[in-house]
Every structure is written in structure tokens, then in C-alpha cells.
UniProtKB/Swiss-Prot annotation:
E.C. number: 3.4.21.-
Name of the protein: Thrombin-like enzyme agkihpin-2
Location of the Peptidase S1 domain: 2-228
Function: Thrombin-like enzyme that shows fibrinogenolytic activity against bovine fibrinogen alpha and beta chains, but not gamma chain. Hydrolyzes fibrin. Enhances ADP-induced human platelet aggregation. Has arginine esterase activity for TAMe (tosyl-arginine methyl ester) substrate. Reduces thrombin-induced thrombosis. Does not have hemorrhagic activity. Reduces the motility of human liver cancer HepG2 cells in a wound-healing assay.
């Protein structure tokens, strides 16, 4: 996923989960309480397995746990999200997890993010912009929260709207970015969980081609309503 930085510290990503189908790790996600994971809608697949407390794909942690989805919730039909809107999915685990050395939830944000913030993102995604090279352990990188227009202007072919519930983040000179396999993972700005990795350019980490993240703060009411049992809750327009 992550280009341009190093392996995450084993103790800094207790909330990071890995989504597998068969034996393939295809997305990340974020544990937000003992029973719920937040990820991207485009990470919806059949037969998802969720690994929690994982660092190395080859050498399991003693407290690593596996779950499967009990329920999945979307703002819209899972096929109706767009590049700029509603790429968000809530997964209820089939049984709760307990906090442990390598498992603990990340709380939802208490305030919206500010442009200019330094944000950290992470995942097991590709670590080469041109080769199918995937790491054994998650990589972490610091990037900047940018004006939304910085994601709109470089991609005229997507016809992105003038405003959106999407965050734009990256390094304008390139070299640091999320990449294939990082989707669904967290964007953490000033210590708060603000974004869900949604989409970016391919090849990754090109100059003036930052990536887009679903804005968690704008979806708080929907998230909290679903968790509280109000499954008819609607997302922000």
C-alpha cells in the first residue's frame, strides 16, 4: 500500500485490520469498537475474513484473531458508491474481540480535520508504484491533508463535483502515497481517525496526484445510528 516510508512499529496499529478473501489480503480496515470495523464500500467482497492484531503476514502474533462479517452496512447499495461519495462500509463482526497487546479500537473523531494537518496512513498494500511488490508487515507514511481541489484538478476525466465528503491527502512532490491494497485503511490526522482510503492514481505516488479518502467526520451520525441498532439510518446527502 504504502510508498515512500517504512515499516509500521508493531505497537502503533492495534486498530488496523486486514481483509482477506481466500488467502489474498485485498484491503485494510479500522476497528472502531469491539464489534465493528469501518472500511471502504469498494472493499466489499464475498467470503471476507477479517484478521485483527496482525503485523507480519508470515509470523502470527499470539493474540491475533479472525472474524467474519455478521452484517454489512452501506450508505447506498454497495454497487452505487462513487469516486467522491459514500465509499464507506460498516462491518459487524460475528463475535466481539477483546483488547490485547495488539488489538484495540480507534475512536471516532471529535472534530473535523484541518487542511495542512500531517496525517498518517498505513497498510499492507503495494510498496512499488510499478511492480506487484507487497510487504510482509504494514508500512506507515506521513502525508499532508490538502485542499479538495488538489484532488479534483488532476483528474478531469472523473468529473468530480465542486464539493464532496471526500478528503484529499498526499505529498505534492510525489513519492509518498497509499497504493493498491491499502484501500479501506485509516487516515489519522493529529491523532484523530479522519479518513478511509478510497482511491488514487495508478501508478501511485506521482507528483501532483494525491489520493482521496472518505471523510469519517461527515458520516458520524450514520455510523453511530447503525451501531445503536437504527439500521434504517440514512447517510448525509
Amino acid at each position: 500500500m504504502i510508498l515512500g516510508d517504512d515499516e509500521c512499529n508493531i505497537n502503533e496499529h492495534r486498530f488496523l485490520v486486514a481483509l482477506y478473501t481466500s488467502r489474498t489480503l485485498f484491503c485494510g480496515g479500522t476497528l472502531i469498537n469491539q464489534e465493528w470495523v469501518l472500511t471502504a464500500a469498494h472493499c466489499n467482497m464475498e467470503d471476507i475474513q477479517i484478521k485483527l492484531g496482525m503485523h507480519s503476514k508470515k509470523v502470527p502474533n499470539e493474540d491475533e484473531q479472525k472474524r467474519v462479517p455478521k452484517e454489512k452496512f452501506f450508505c447506498l447499495s454497495s454497487k452505487n458508491y462513487t469516486l467522491w461519495d459514500k465509499d464507506i462500509m460498516l462491518i459487524r463482526l460475528d463475535s466481539p474481540v477483546k483488547n490485547s497487546a495488539h488489538i484495540a479500537p480507534l475512536s471516532l473523531p471529535s472534530s473535523p480535520p484541518s487542511v495542512g494537518s500531517v496525517c498518517r496512513t498505513m497498510g499492507w498494500g503495494r510498496i512499488s508504484s510499478t511492480k506487484e511488490t507487497y510487504p510482509d508487515v504494514p508500512h506507515c507514511v506521513n502525508i499532508n491533508l490538502l485542499e479538495y481541489e488538489m484532488c479534483r484538478a488532476p483528474y478531469p476525466e472523473f468529473e468530480l463535483p465542486a464539493t464532496s465528503r471526500t478528503l484529499c491527502a498526499g505529498i505534492l512532490e510525489g513519492g509518498k502515497d497509499t497504493c493498491v491494497g491499502d484501500s479501506g485503511g485509516p487516515l489519522i490526522c493529529n491523532g484523530q481517525f479522519q479518513g478511509i482510503a478510497s482511491w488514487g492514481d495508478d501508478p501511485c505516488a506521482q507528483p501532483h496526484k494525491p489520493a482521496a479518502y472518505t471523510k469519517v467526520f461527515d458520516h458520524l451520525d450514520w455510523i453511530e445510528n447503525i451501531i445503536a441498532g437504527n439500521t434504517d439510518a440514512s447517510c448525509p446527502p
